[in-house]
Every structure is written in structure tokens, then in C-alpha cells.
Amino acid sequence: CFHLFNDYSGSPKVLKIVLEGLLKKGYQINLITSTGGALDELLYYKNLSKHSYPYRFSNNPIVTMLRYYMVQLYTFILTFRWLFYKDVTFYINTLLPVGPALAGRIMGKRVVYHYHENAFVKGTFYKVLATIMQKLAHKIICVSEYQASFLQQKKCVITVPNALPQNFVNRLTPNFQAAFKRKHILMLGSLKLYKSPLEFI
């Protein structure tokens, strides 16, 4: 499983839920991601091995892109340690880990993308990555039908909406009548301006 930047944003948190479900079912998982972040909370599972690299954003976009390309080269090369393993699936979380996706395809492995972004509202770089994803992926998991509607590839695309962590759901005690009277709404969203509405009416 490949994820570029292990922080506490939405995509690594969703990946954590997915991986935890697989780990509890006994799957052996190799996680390749940066140091720190939400995914490190899975390290106590004995059937998970983590391979880390240093990665962070810079205020200088050129430095950020150089770091990104270095990580793609590193993970592309690292990926070949699974060349002779059978029944290996390369799970690519977000558009960004294109290096291991390409290596997986070269080796004849099954490549599954979990596509969190909407590349077609983010600019040329993400549009190029989305085009590459559609060429390399055996399966693309989208988080909404709206997001999937922008993809040219339709055959291998499925929609799986993001879930909330089970420990959060367990704390809920729904009372629909009381909720209707209170008229309070919980809106879960990103703090990033381009992802969130400015007003909720």
C-alpha cells in the first residue's frame, strides 16, 4: 500500500480505516509512506510492515516538486522487492504515488487506486496524474458518483463513500425525534478553502 504524505488529513484517515479492516481479517500489508501521521497508529498490528521515507511540503513549490519526484523514484525502485511475490495487489492511495503504480504495472501486479481528489478542479498537474491513473489502474475506487463522473474510464470504476471511524460511530446515540426538534446539523468537512463551502444555509 502506497501513500505519499502521512499526516492527519482526510485521505490517510480513510486509508487507516480501510487498512485496519484488512489487518483484522488477517491480510499481510506492507505500507510505504512518510514518517509520522495517522497511519502510524496501525504499527501495533503484527501483520503490518511499514517502510518510511522523509517527506514534507515546502513554501517553495520547486523544492516541493523535487521532493515529490525523489519519492516517486525511491518508491518505484523499492517496489521491485515484490517482483517475485504472487497474489500481490498494489493499493495506491490518492493520485500522487504514480511511481509505484507504474512499477506495479510493469511487474504485472494488480493496481488499485483509491481516488480521493477531484483532479479536474485542481489544475494541470492533477489532470495529468488522473490520466495516468486511468491508464495504469485495474480498478479505481472513487469516493462519490460526482467525482467518478469526471473520469473517462468507466469500466473499472466503483464508488465507495468515505466512512467514519468505528470508535466515533460507537459514541453516537441517535434519537431522531430529539434531533428533528433541535435542528442542529453536524457538517464534517475540510478546512481547506477549495474543498469547503464558505456558507452553510
What residue ranges belong to the model's regions?
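Short hydrophobic "strand-cap" motifs at the C-terminus of beta-strands
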Residues: 2-3, 143, 160, 185-191
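N-terminal strand-loop element at the rim of the active site
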Residues: 2-9, 21-66
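A short, histidine- and acid-enriched strand-loop-helix "catalytic/donor-clamping" loop
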Residues: 5-8, 59, 98, 107-125
